[in-house]
């Protein structure tokens, strides 16, 4: 399909640099889905609480999305002179086109819709920072992404029309702002919690997969995951957070033997039809930013 135009402005970014960041985004998606065992989520062992998707769907989806990540970076660069709050409007058509390719690659299965939003924002932020010759760090990337999303929660969640979306309903009922709120706040769960936790575990010499699984537990314990709440209600969300925190309090995931606790947690999530997809999306961002 034809790609939406980015801007009439030109970018000075090298294609090799753009492709390098796009490759990191693809690797981040693959790293997350291949990580096993993950409670309630699709991984190399099973399909978690999902009956409509499998590991191969995520592999195809990630490849389809990778082709669009350079467009987000390019738009971020080309729109560098725009006010940041005007950028999101220009990103939407790119995101919708990317989403269309994802659905075509998976025969209609929603594998990475959340990641298109979050990785798209971060890639656009990287493009803007590079174009402006500003420092590209996890903190500056997330702060720039937040500036794109200023007012997003108010505009899209705080509405009183009769046809509420799932996100609007969860916001009104439980006060959960989901992916929009996390983006508008500059991804504090990643910047202040998951990323430093993951990097500390790596510095301590922990196996990277075990470190990432432990970081997933941290996200599950702290994230007001709208995916979980939509499937299991407030009770399901509180149960998941409590169980994840209990595992962390008991020492977390430090050895291969600890994976037995995750396998049991996975079985319980499947029985409850709970899948922490929002936390999985944040784990993708955590790994992505850890490489920068």
Swiss-Prot record:
Which keywords are on file for this protein? ATP-binding, Nucleotide-binding, Transferase
| Annotated GO biological process | prosthetic group biosynthetic process
Keyword S-adenosyl-L-methionine recorded:
no
Pfam family for this entry, one: CitG
Instruction: Kindly list the GO molecular function terms attached to this UniProt entry.
Output: ATP binding; triphosphoribosyl-dephospho-CoA synthase activity
Listed under catalytic activity are: 3'-dephospho-CoA + ATP = 2'-(5''-triphospho-alpha-D-ribosyl)-3'-dephospho-CoA + adenine
This protein's record includes keyword Nucleotide-binding:
yes
Cite the Gene3D superfamilies for this sequence: Triphosphoribosyl-dephospho-CoA protein
Q: What is its EC number?
A: 2.4.2.52
Xref: PANTHER family: 2-(5''-TRIPHOSPHORIBOSYL)-3'-DEPHOSPHOCOENZYME-A SYNTHASE (PTHR30201:SF2), TRIPHOSPHORIBOSYL-DEPHOSPHO-COA SYNTHASE (PTHR30201)
Q: What does this protein do?
A: Catalyzes the formation of 2-(5''-triphosphoribosyl)-3'-dephosphocoenzyme-A, the precursor of the prosthetic group of the holo-acyl carrier protein (gamma chain) of citrate lyase, from ATP and dephospho-CoA.
Family statement: Belongs to the CitG/MdcB family.
The protein's matches in HAMAP family, at most eight in alphabetical order, are given as: CitG (MF_00397)
User: What NCBIfam families is this protein classified in?
Assistant: citrate_citG, PRK10096.1
Please report the name of this protein according to its UniProt entry.
2-(5''-triphosphoribosyl)-3'-dephosphocoenzyme-A synthase
